[in-house]
C-alpha cells in the first residue's frame, strides 16, 4: 500500500507547495549581478545546487562532496561542508546550517573513537565520513587520510561562526563547546 507518510494533497496542491518553497528560497538566497549573463547564470546554478542538496531539519545527513551531481565520493561528507558550504547556509537558511552542524555534533563519539585508535586525546573527525561518523576513506587514500588532521578544526571553526552569526548561544553551549 501507499505509505501513510505520503501527503494526501492533490498534484496541484503539491505543485503549489513546491512553488511557494522555491519562491521563499530564492527570496532568501538570490544574488543578482549586472553586465554578464553567463556569470549570473553560473551563480544561480550554484545557488540552486546548494539549496536543492540540503535536507532541512535532518541532522542525520550531511552534504556529499558532489551533491546531487554525480556518484563521486559515494555520497560521503568532507570538511568542505563546514568551510565552503556552511557560510552560504548561515546567510540564506541558518536552520539548515544548524542541521549540518548537528550532523557533526551527533557523531562526536565516533570522532573520539578515531582519536583514541590513533593514540590521541579528544576527537578527530574523519576526512571522509559516512552517516555513522566512521572514517570511510578508501584504502588507496588511507595514508593521506591520516595526515588530514584539520577536519576537527574546520568543525570547530564552523561551530564558532554559527554561534557568532546567529547568536544561538544555547546551541553553542549545548553542542558546540563539547564538540
At which residue positions do the language-model features occur?
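Acidic/polar, glycine-enriched structural segments that form the non-catalytic walls/loops
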Residues: 1-73
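Aromatic- and histidine-enriched alpha-helix N-cap/loop-to-helix transition segments
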Residues: 41, 75-82, 92, 147-154, ...
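Well-ordered alpha-helical scaffold segments within catalytic/enzyme domains
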Residues: 27-32, 48-53, 83-94, 154-169
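Residue-level recognition of alpha-helical structural elements
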Residues: 35, 39, 168-173
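Segments forming glycine/polar-rich beta-alpha architectures that bind adenosine-containing cofactors
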Residues: 67-76, 81-82, 86-87
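Helix-terminus loop motifs that line ligand-binding clefts
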Residues: 54-69, 95-158, 163, 170-174
Amino acid at each position: 500500500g501507499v505509505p501513510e507518510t505520503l501527503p494526501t494533497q492533490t498534484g496541484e496542491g503539491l505543485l503549489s507547495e513546491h512553488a511557494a518553497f522555491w519562491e521563499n528560497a530564492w527570496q532568501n538566497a538570490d544574488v543578482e549581478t549586472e553586465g554578464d549573463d553567463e556569470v549570473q547564470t553560473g551563480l544561480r546554478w550554484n545557488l540552486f545546487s546548494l539549496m536543492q542538496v540540503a535536507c532541512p531539519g535532518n541532522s542525520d545527513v550531511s552534504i556529499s562532496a558532489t551533491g546531487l551531481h554525480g556518484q563521486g565520493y559515494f555520497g560521503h561528507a568532507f570538511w568542505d561542508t563546514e568551510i565552503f558550504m556552511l557560510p552560504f547556509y548561515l546567510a540564506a537558511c541558518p536552520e539548515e546550517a544548524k542541521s549540518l552542524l548537528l550532523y557533526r555534533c551527533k557523531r562526536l563519539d565516533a570522532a573520539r573513537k578515531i582519536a583514541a585508535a590513533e593514540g590521541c586525546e579528544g576527537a578527530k573527525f574523519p576526512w571522509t565520513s559516512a552517516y555513522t561518523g566512521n572514517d570511510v576513506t578508501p584504502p588507496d587514500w588511507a595514508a593521506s587520510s591520516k595526515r588530514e588532521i584539520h577536519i576537527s578544526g574546520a568543525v570547530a571553526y564552523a561551530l564558532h561562526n554559527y554561534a557568532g552569526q546567529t547568536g544561538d548561544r544555547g546551541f553553542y553551549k549545548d553542542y558546540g563547546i563539547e564538540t
